[in-house]
Structure formats: structure tokens, C-alpha cells
Amino acid sequence: MMQDVSSSPVSPADDSLSNSEEEPDRQQPPSGKRGGRKRRSSRRSAGGGAGPGGAAGGGVGGGDEPGSPAQGKRGKKSAGCGGGGGGGAGGGGSSSGGGSPQSYEELQTQRVMANVRERQRTQSLNEAFAALPKIIPTLPSDKLSKIQTLKLAARYIDFLYQVLQSDELDSKMASYVAHERLSYAFSVWRMEGAWSMSASH
């Protein structure tokens, strides 16, 4: 019986069954490979989608991050520009500070010279006003201010002009020769009211 079974030929149905059983086993690895490819492709697509987004996010984050190299360079440049501006301002301050003592000294010298000129002018005026009462005939009771002294000098000049232009110049020339007599005549002329009238004008 064993010889019959071993020697019996295999039927085509059994071959087809065995082949059909082997074919699914052979076909399974390709399906697994395809699934792996799909999974890999899906992972790649997901990674690629995340990649640009991550790159974009990284780009934005890199722009916002203070420690990025680009911003560090910009910060250094701005700091350098600010330092240069500060240096320029410092230089301007030093130049102005160097020029300020000269201008201050010039102003001081100008003020001193102006004060000297004002003192000289005041001194000369005081000397002139002190000399006028010696020339103009005055009364012992006169306590004249500078303006009154000037008015009295103007009236004395007017009196002398009237004396010189009078019709009786020849007959009265001898009586007005001496300075004392002129002074007396002027004093009388003042007391008669001419001085008060001229002072009122």
C-alpha cells in the first residue's frame, strides 16, 4: 500500500491547490512592500509638510530670536553707529568747550573797556559841570543841579549876546569891560525875572 501511494501520481487538483497556497505566500511580501512604501511616502509627505512649515517657523523664529547671527550683526552695527554719533557729539562738545574760554575772555575784555570808557566820560562831564559855575556868574545862595547849571549857562550866553548887539554898545562899552561888572549885571538881570522866565520855558 505504501508503494502504491508513493508511486501514485499527483493529481492536477492537488498541484493547483498547492500552487494556490504558495501564491498568496509569495504575493504577501510585495503587498507588505507596497504598504511600507506607502507608509514611507506618507511619512515623507508629512515630514515634508512639516519641513517647510518648520523651515518657515524657523525663519520667523530666527528673525524674532535676539540671539540669531543676523540680528547680532545688526545690533553690533547699530551699536557702532550709536557709538560713532556719541563720539561726534563728544568731539563737538570738546571743540565748543575749547572755544568758550576765548569768547568769555573777549566778552570780559569788552565789558572792562566799556566800563573804562563810561568812567572817563562821566569824569569829563563832572569836571565840565564843576568848571561852569566858575565861569558863569552865580549867587552865593545858588545850589544848582546839572540841568539848572546848563540852563544858567545858556542864559548867560544870551545875555552876553544882547549886550554885544545893543544900540548903546559904544557908550556902555567901558562899563561892561570888567568881568566883575558883567557878573553883577547878569546877577541883576537874573533877579529882575528874566531867569525865572527863561527857566519856565
Swiss-Prot record:
Out of the domains of life, which is the source? Eukaryota
What's one GO MF term for it?
Answer: RNA polymerase II transcription regulatory region sequence-specific DNA binding
Q: What is its main location?
A: nucleus
**Location of the protein in the cell:** Nucleus
Residue ranges, compositional bias (Basic residues): 34-43
One GO term (biological process): muscle organ development
According to the record, the residues making up region (Disordered) are 1-106
On whether Glycosyltransferase is a keyword of this UniProt record, the answer is no
Q: What Gene3D superfamilies does its record include?
A: Helix-loop-helix DNA-binding domain
One GO CC term on file? nucleus
UniProt KW DNA-binding keyword: yes
Keyword tags:
Activator, Biological rhythms, Developmental protein, Differentiation, DNA-binding, Myogenesis, Nucleus, Repressor, Transcription, Transcription regulation
Q: Which InterPro entries match?
A: bHLH_dom (IPR011598), E-box_TF_Regulators (IPR050283), HLH_DNA-bd_sf (IPR036638), TWIST1_bHLH (IPR047093)
Domain annotation bHLH: ranges:
109-160
What segments bear the compositional bias annotation Gly residues?
Answer: 46-65, 80-100
- Pfam families the UniProt entry points to: HLH
Segment Sufficient for transactivation activity: which positions? 162-190
Ranges annotated as biased composition (Low complexity): 1-18
Main function: Acts as a transcriptional regulator. Inhibits myogenesis by sequestrating E proteins, inhibiting trans-activation by MEF2, and inhibiting DNA-binding by MYOD1 through physical interaction. This interaction probably involves the basic domains of both proteins. Also represses expression of pro-inflammatory cytokines such as TNFA and IL1B. Regulates cranial suture patterning and fusion. Activates transcription as a heterodimer with E proteins. Regulates gene expression differentially, depending on dimer composition.
Subunit comment: Efficient DNA binding requires dimerization with another bHLH protein. Homodimer or heterodimer with E proteins such as TCF3. ID1 binds preferentially to TCF3 but does not interact efficiently with TWIST1 so ID1 levels control the amount of TCF3 available to dimerize with TWIST and thus determine the type of dimer formed.
Among PANTHER family, the record links this protein to: BASIC HELIX-LOOP-HELIX TRANSCRIPTION FACTOR, TWIST, TWIST-RELATED PROTEIN 1
Question: What is the protein's given name?
Answer: Twist-related protein 1
Organism annotation: Pan troglodytes (Chimpanzee)
